[in-house]
């Protein structure tokens, strides 16, 4: 088990929480499961009262404390010889102004796995930047990354580089990735699996009102999204042809979700305003006149709705481009 940083939300979590977490980690070690923990930036080791400084002596498994990249453990894991490389960012000691390029590799027999709580490329706020070219040249069999909460994978040289993501979300802006990341090292290479984890789902759904012609259609879309186990935020976008009230929608449909938010980001267009725009000698005016001709020529309700939606989409695109 590899923890690539930010096990805790802060460097000095409540002691009761620390003891519960350490007891759970100890169960892994007692079961013969290898464990490596790398501090992150939320639970940074820099501080004198950091949880990792306070519990360094009795932390289960391998605790990374060195401020620069180095070999932190070599041993048998799952019947294979494995060499682990990592660092614990330490303010004032760990180089952070430019992406790290000094990435060691002993060349010894066995697998070589790097574990970094960092970001690929240039530095971001409160991040440890890692040089892509250096990671690719280091020749690791696998690179486990933390810091970015969204799951992602890429290959640098022969090395698979993986962000597992945050398993359980913290909110709508950080919804999490409800999967474990399981890495299998076989004779033919590395196989990465992402089995699902049963956690509460956090979703952000978008409904484009330009496609809808009545409040009833909107209600049907919301009903279709219902999930009593999920936190859901619905964003209403596009150009609306009818009146809506986000609070009323929440009131009518909240029982279909564990938690429901509706945010109205739509625009509405007054028919009289469209008519005035259509009389103008502008690109927008010419577009409105052309679509008006199509509306008048429509022979079926389907053709009329298609022309109406095209008009609204076009006006919205012209507004955004302006």
Question: For the regions a protein language model found, what residue spans apply to each?
Answer:
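Short acidic, S/G/P-rich loop/turn micro-motifs used as interaction or catalytic elements
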Residues: 8, 91-92, 239-243
């Amino acid at each position: 088990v590899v923890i690539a940083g930010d096990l805790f939300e802060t460097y000095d979590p409540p002691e009761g929480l620390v003891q519960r977490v350490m007891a759970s980690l100890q169960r892994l070690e007692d079961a013969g499961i290898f464990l490596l923990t790398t501090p992150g930036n939320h639970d940074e080791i820099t501080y004198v009262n950091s949880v990792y400084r306070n519990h360094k002596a009795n932390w289960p498994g391998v605790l990374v404390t060195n401020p620069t990249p180095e070999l932190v453990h070599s041993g048998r894991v799952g019947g294979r010889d494995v060499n682990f490389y990592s660092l614990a960012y330490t303010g004032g000691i760990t180089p952070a102004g430019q992406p790290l390029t000094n990435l060691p590799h002993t060349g010894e027999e066995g697998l070589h796995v790097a574990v970094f709580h960092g970001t690929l490329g240039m530095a971001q706020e409160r991040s440890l930047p890692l040089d892509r070219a250096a990671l690719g040249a280091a020749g690791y069999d696998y690179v486990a990354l933390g810091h970015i909460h969204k799951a992602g994978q890429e290959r640098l040289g022969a090395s698979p580089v993986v962000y597992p993501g945050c398993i359980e979300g913290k909110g709508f802006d950080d919804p999490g990735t409800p999967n474990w990341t399981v890495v299998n090292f076989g004779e033919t290479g590395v196989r990465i699996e992402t089995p699902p984890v049963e956690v509460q789902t956090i979703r952000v759904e978008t409904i484009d009102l330009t496609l809808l012609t009545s409040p009833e259609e909107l209600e049907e879309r919301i009903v279709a999204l219902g999930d009593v186990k999920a936190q859901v935020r619905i964003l209403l976008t596009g150009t609306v042809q009818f009146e809506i009230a986000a609070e009323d929608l929440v009131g009518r449909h909240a029982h279909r979700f564990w938690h429901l938010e509706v945010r109205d980001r739509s625009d509405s267009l007054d028919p009289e305003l469209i008519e005035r725009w259509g009389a103008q000698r502008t690109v927008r005016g010419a577009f409105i006149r052309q679509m008006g001709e199509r509306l008048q020529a429509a022979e079926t309700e389907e053709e009329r709705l298609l022309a109406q939606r095209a008009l609204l989409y076009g006006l919205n695109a012209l507004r955004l481009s302006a």
